[in-house]
Design a protein with these regions (language model features):
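Active-site recognition of the HExxH zinc-binding catalytic motif
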Residues: 72-84
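Metalloprotease/metallohydrolase-associated module, dominated by Zn2+-dependent proteases
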Residues: 1-69, 85-126
Length: 126
């Protein structure tokens, strides 16, 4: 039985660590809730590209794709952990866009400007 973590998941977890460390080092109060690691569960199902349980108790990610697309979904799910609402409200998109910008500046994410397939769904930055 192979118990090694898939390489693309390992890379995304390292980028996630870099983001958390940056938020700690800069005392980013807006994203203070993201400074502690959230457990990540990987899957290869195509009906769900990502989910967030109880605002950061666990994040599930489809890992059938390249690391940038996986990171896109992780950022999307992390943004859900920053607001009380469960929908994609204006407040959600504000937090999401700020996280995208931080990750871009850290060099751990390249924006996806065109609709692109990932795990059977279209993903794109808004």
């Amino acid at each position: 039985m192979n118990t090694r973590e898939p390489e693309n998941l390992r890379i995304v977890k390292e980028k996630y660590r870099i983001l958390r460390e940056h938020l700690k080092e800069t005392n980013n109060e807006e994203f203070e809730m993201l400074q502690k690691p959230i457990p990540i569960t990987a899957h290869t199902r195509t009906e769900t590209i990502g989910y967030n349980t109880n605002k950061g108790q666990e994040i599930g990610l489809c890992i059938s794709g390249d690391t940038n697309k996986i990171m896109h979904v992780l950022i999307h799910e992390l943004a859900h952990s920053t607001i009380k609402e469960y929908d994609h409200s204006d407040k959600y998109w504000d937090k999401y866009n700020k996280l995208i910008q931080i990750c871009k500046e850290l060099g751990i994410y390249e924006p996806i400007t065109q609709k692109t397939k990932f795990c059977g769904k279209d993903v794109q930055d808004k």
